[in-house]
């Protein structure tokens, strides 16, 4: 059994998008599934992770060769907005383009129920919800007090620290993050992640003026660390995960934060309907609400720990070992036989 697991523009795309692709390949490695990262029509299934023009070309060729095509729906026009310079302008033509691209697949994989519902207006291709999951191995050491001390000292942070992990873009709730920090001058806020969309020097040109202005004019207690080479260090340093994102397909950093026992404060959006308010997360819709939610946790260490424990327990269902069966079931269905034979 062989999967052609193609990720167009793999060398330039970073963040959760790339992490999801890595997770899929980790699952295949762990399950002993043969795959190639090239578009190969001699494979049993063509799995496309980014519907660029080359992917659509190979999807059409796959149909002619009677090779089933599955597409991962990492992108929607809505979550493309407020990402980088010109993204809002490009979001309008992107929607019909994605609708056309996704329609070339025999089956779609959606990272959340929310994304699956959004795609109802794109095409009528059958779809299955499969979480992006998270690789718990990359979080090893997050509970190491020495690593925590190193990252707190490196970024001049005093605990308890409110933190976020991910690309610094408007869609992730940058304005709310900065304003909430401004309202809470007694608390250190840290955003760990690329300041440029792709992380590179050239990508600085893609950063929107609004993003640049918000970062430049952020208050002294709001730190933007840039890329960190050991993500476990970010989770070691942080105490409350603050995710005021305006639109999200799933939110892999949220799953990782929950797994480390960091209680999450999130924006109350449809994507996070699966989180129980007051049980596994606190939710708010504006800066006033975020301030109240964060202070309620920062002022009560026992509640902070209790919510963190519940979040960690909830996250177990999203570990790679737990979501692997869902991904393989999609492959099984396309071939009408098990991808991994019983032993």
Segments from the language model and where they lie:
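Membrane-proximal helix-turn-helix segments that form the acceptor-binding/catalytic region
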Residues: 89-107, 212-214
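Acidic anion/phosphate-binding donor-loop and adjacent secondary structure
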Residues: 134-153, 159
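Conserved donor-binding/catalytic core segment of Leloir-type glycosyltransferases
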Residues: 153-172, 178-184, 190
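A short, well-ordered alpha-helix in the C-terminal region of glycosyltransferases
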Residues: 303-317
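Conserved acidic donor-binding segment of nucleotide-sugar-dependent glycosyltransferases
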Residues: 277-288, 295-302
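Short hydrophobic beta-strand element within catalytic cores of glycosyltransferases
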Residues: 263-266
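Aromatic "clamp/platform" in nucleotide-sugar-dependent glycosyltransferases that forms part
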Residues: 227, 246
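Short, structured helix-loop element that forms part of the nucleotide-activated donor/catalytic region
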Residues: 188-220, 225
């Amino acid at each position: 059994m062989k999967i052609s697991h193609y990720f167009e523009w793999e060398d330039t795309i970073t963040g959760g998008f790339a992490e999801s692709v890595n997770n899929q390949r980790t699952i295949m490695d762990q399950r002993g599934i043969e795959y190639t990262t090239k578009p190969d029509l001699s494979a049993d299934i063509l799995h496309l992770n980014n519907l660029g023009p080359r992917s659509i070309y190979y999807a059409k060729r796959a149909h002619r060769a009677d090779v089933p095509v599955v597409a991962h729906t990492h992108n929607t026009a809505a979550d493309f907005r407020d990402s980088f310079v010109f993204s809002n302008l490009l979001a309008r033509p992107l929607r019909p383009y994605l609708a056309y691209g996704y329609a070339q697949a025999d089956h779609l994989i959606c990272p959340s129920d929310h994304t699956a519902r959004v795609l109802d207006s794109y095409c009528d291709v059958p779809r299955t919800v499969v979480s992006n999951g998270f690789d718990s191995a990359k979080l090893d050491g997050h509970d190491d007090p020495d690593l925590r001390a190193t990252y707190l000292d490196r970024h001049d942070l005093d605990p308890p620290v409110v933190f976020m992990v991910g690309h610094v873009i408007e869609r992730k709730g940058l304005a709310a993050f900065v304003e909430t920090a401004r309202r809470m001058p007694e608390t250190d806020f840290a955003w760990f992640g690329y300041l440029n969309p792709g992380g590179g020097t050239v990508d600085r040109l893609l950063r929107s003026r609004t993003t640049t202005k918000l970062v430049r004019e952020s208050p002294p207690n709001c730190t933007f660390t840039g890329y960190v080479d050991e993500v476990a260090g970010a989770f070691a340093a942080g105490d409350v995960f603050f995710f005021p994102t305006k639109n999200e397909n799933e939110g892999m950093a949220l799953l990782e934060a929950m797994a480390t026992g960091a209680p999450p404060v999130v924006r109350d959006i449809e994507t996070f309907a699966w989180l129980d308010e007051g049980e596994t997360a606190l939710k708010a819709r504006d800066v006033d609400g975020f301030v109240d939610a964060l202070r309620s946790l920062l002022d009560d260490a026992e509640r902070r720990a209790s919510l963190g424990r519940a979040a960690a327990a909830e996250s177990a269902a999203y570990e790679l070992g737990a979501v692997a069966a869902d991904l393989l079931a999609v492959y099984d269905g396309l071939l009408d036989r098990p991808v991994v034979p019983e032993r």
